[in-house]
Each structure stands twice: as structure tokens, then as C-alpha cells.
Amino acid sequence: MSIPRMKSYFSLIAAVLMLGQVATAQAENLPDFTGLVEQASPAVVNISTRQKLPDRAIANQQMPDLEGLPPMLREFLERSMPPGSRPPGAGKGDRQRETQSLGSGFIISPDGYILTNNHVIDGADEILVRLSDRSELKAKLIGTDSRTDVAVLKIDGKDLPTAKLGNSNTLKVGEWVLAIGSPFGFDHSVTKGIVSAKGRSLPNDTYVPFIQTDVAINPGNSGGPLFNMAGEVVGINSQIFTRSGGFMGLSFAIPIDVAMDVANQLKASGKVSRGWLGVVIQEVNKDLAESFGLDKPAGALVAQVLEDGPAAKGGLQVGDVILSANGQPIIMSADLPHLIGNLKDGSKAELEVIRDGKRQKLTVTVGALPDEGQEMGDVAGTGAERSSNRLGVSVIELTAEQKKSLDLKGGVAIKEVTGGPASLIGLQPGDVITHLNNQAITSSKQFTEVAKSLPKDRSVSMRVLRQGRATFITFKLSE
């Protein structure tokens, strides 16, 4: 072999060896989950429920967890279910008289207290818990909280394996996390991923700052624990965002600090109490920030103040932007309900607000969150008609009865949308305009005057009441 060819040969060998060393180094840097799984698995349980339903309800019931699965997998899962819980048409065609759902949970005390999701056991007539040794026990429901989707169960036992609880506040974005649960009934399945974001706000989940991860979560994982690399529970896997019905890389967990606060209250009294301001708030976007004179989008915009509520008594007004509560900044509007919800009835909330472009501080005595929301009436007015072609709406006065029903001192109702900005921003007949360009509307005449003087060089805000729900919207007039 010639010297040049020998040099090429040895160079190739050296390159292969270097690649092997790099691959080995990368493998050594990846986390080893085996010890964590061995330590944590015994405390994770499978939860199954049975619910008796009328024949008609059962005949119409779908089983979405099995829909769309490959035939062999669907058949396997149907065979593994008790005969009474199989979907319509399964087996010999017997009419189904009870339904079954599957979920996960974890033991938090040696005497048998278990955490899971409310939606896992909601409406159940019987709750069964299967432990890691495959033994099954009936569980007693201690309490539930639908607002956070947390439930506490109790099984009879002693010296049971328990999950080690961590601190979700110290969790960092990018940190490795691991889930153990029963997706589709496959007990103690392990999946891993990283924390994608913290403090996520989801629709209809006002009181939970969710942990977002890319851990694979599927039906049956709900209620199971999310672990950090120290083997500590940092969250309860609760829901996913999906367009297909299956996992798409967006999973959400309830922080364990939130869950344990709820659990401790449920164990003590069977119910959960939360602080309450009595306001309806919305996000401050770029255009709203501009219209209210803010440097950047931040805070919670007060769209509605409930009569005789804590906020009304404390002097909070529609159009105020709440920037902080007890020194804690309100970055997103969803931060406010969580901060106030953690306060006790009768405690003080020091609020920093922007009003008419100026900062000021208010002290509000926090109330107790009521069980049900307060409803406001619809609008169907018959008053004096005015129009404003600049906005593209025809408006009418509210009657005295309508003002009383809606708890309003003024405002005008939209009779017709004729085009212009009103059409672009989605205004509808029956909407009530209570504020325009940061001014309270007291009559249709004043509304027309304010509309004529609207600026064209910046965003303009408008407060609209629709079916009892108030919101601020923004628009710009064309040149």
C-alpha cells in the first residue's frame, strides 16, 4: 500500500473513532430515567369508574377514547373492559347499562389519600383504584373542585407507597419532566419531555397557571403525576391541546402547589374558598394599550364591575387597568384571578391601576368567590334613534327598565350595523355601547357627539355589553 493511501486509510479510521466518541458523549449527557421510574412508580395508581345511565342515554353515548383506533387495538381494549362497559354493538349486542372511564392518580399519604382530576371521577357511582401490585380497592370521594379540576380520593390502607411532592414554583422552562399513567388503560406507561412554558392560561380555566410540556399525554393519563428529575411530583397531568383527538405535543399540567392547596381545603372542609373582586377583566393587547395610554401591553383591563361587589365598594371602575396586586405584577390578565383567588375572604388587596392615563393605588377588601356567576339581562330596546355614519351603526336609547335590568346608568343599544368600523370589528344589533374613547356614554346624543370627535391617528377603545358580558374592543378610523 502506498504512503498516500495509508494516510487516507488511517485518517478514515480516526474520523470513525471520533464520531463514536461524540455519540458516546452525547449518550452520556442524556438523562437516565430508570432510577426515577423505579422510585416513583409504586405510588401511581389506575383509576376506573362506573356510572349507571338510562338506556336511552347509553344508546346515544359515544366512546371517543376508542374511536378511530386500529381494529386490533380497539378489539383488545373492548375485551379488557367489563361486559357492562363495552360500547354499543360490542359483544353479543346486549344493551349497555353502565359506562366506565379510565384515568390515573397518585397516593400522597401512607393512609391512602389520592390526588386525581375532577373530570376523571365526575358523575361516578363507583370508583375503583388499582395499585401497582394489581390489587383493587374501592375509593371514597373526599371532595372535588371543578374550577381547578382537582379531586381527592381515599382508600383504606396503611404504609402505602407515597409520591414525593416537589415545588412547582422552582420548575424551569427547558427542564426534563416525566409522566407515569394509564393511557388507554395501559398501566404505568412512562413518557418524558421538557417543560415548554409556565403560567399558561387556558379558556375556562381561570384559576390555574398551567405547566405546558411536550410529554406524550393521552386519554387515561389524566390525573397522573408529572415528575421532575429528582422524582418529585411537580404537576397533575390534566389536558392536551389537539386537533386530531390525540397527542400533538401540547400537554398541560396543574402545578402541584395549586393542587395541594385545593386538596388540603377539601380534606379539611370538603370545599374550596377563594378570594373574589367582583370584576370581569380582559387582556390588554397592543391597540388597547395605546388607547389607554400604556407604554406596552400589560395588566388586566376592567371591563365590568359587579354591583355591590368588593371592587365596586373599593372604588374600582370600568376602564381601569390593574397593573399589580399586593406588589405582584400583572403581566397577563390571567395572573389576576390566580393572585386574588389565593387571598382569604376579608383580606386586603393593594391594587395599582391606570385610570385616565394616571397611576393610582386602591385598597379593596377581598370577598369570597360565589358558587355561581351573576347573570345580566339581554337588550331589546325601543328608544329614540340616533345614527353615526362614521362608525357605521344606528343606535337607540335604553329604556329605564333596561338600564335597571342591566345595572347601567347610561349607554346606547345598536339597532343596525350599516358598515364601516362597526362591521369590521363585529358589532351586532342588540349590543350595548357603554363607553367610547374612554368616555362613559349617557345618551344617544352624546354618543353622536363623541363619535364625531374621534381621532384618526391612534387606536380608539369601545366598551360593549353583549348578553350580559362586557368587553373592550379597539378600532381605527380610516383617513
Curated annotation (Swiss-Prot):
Annotated PDZ domain residues: 266-357, 363-468
PROSITE patterns: PDZ
GO biological process: proteolysis
Catalytic reaction list: Acts on substrates that are at least partially unfolded. The cleavage site P1 residue is normally between a pair of hydrophobic residues, such as Val-|-Val
A cellular component annotation (GO) from this entry: periplasmic space
Region spans: Disordered: 77-99
Signal peptide as annotated in the record: 1-27
Annotated keywords: Hydrolase, Periplasm, Protease, Repeat, Serine protease, Signal, Stress response
Active site: 119 (charge relay system), 149 (charge relay system), 222 (charge relay system)
Record localization: Periplasm
Pfam families attached to this UniProt entry: PDZ_2, Trypsin_2
Cell division is among the record's keywords: no
EC assignment: 3.4.21.107
GO MF terms held by the record: serine-type endopeptidase activity
Binding site for substrate: 220-222, 277-281
Protein family: Belongs to the peptidase S1C family.
Job of this protein: Might be efficient in the degradation of transiently denatured and unfolded proteins which accumulate in the periplasm following stress conditions.
Record-given protein name: Probable periplasmic serine endoprotease DegP-like
Species, as recorded: Pseudomonas savastanoi pv. phaseolicola (strain 1448A / Race 6) (Pseudomonas syringae pv. phaseolicola (strain 1448A / Race 6))
Organism lineage string: Bacteria, Pseudomonadati, Pseudomonadota, Gammaproteobacteria, Pseudomonadales
